[in-house]
Amino acid sequence: MNFRPLGASGLLVSPVCLGTMTFGTPVPQNDAVRILHAALDRGVNFIDTANVYEGYNRFLGSPGGVAEEIVGAAIHDRRDKAVVATKVCAPVGPGPQD
């Protein structure tokens, strides 16, 4: 896989980025882990996630972060092989500190 620079960060990422929005529902954790491992094994090192990604069952006040938890569990022993792009894009609870 040919890697490309990510802006001026010095990071090199694959031209393909694996999105994780559906991790949780409809993609259960065991399948999501298999997908992540297959991507890493094939040279995809760029993973996109967010604090609100948990599949299609998201609702206001739900804790969110399911996809981030799955990604973390799946790559904990391969952390040096992955560039994780995450973002905070919406409240995950009703309170100002949520």
Task: Pin down the residues of each PLM region.
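A short, structured active-site edge motif that brings together acidic residues
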Residues: K81-V92
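A short acidic, helix-capping loop that chelates divalent metal ions and anchors anionic groups
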Residues: Y53-R58, P91-Q97
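N-terminal binding-site loop/beta-alpha segment at the start of enzyme catalytic domains
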Residues: M1-V83
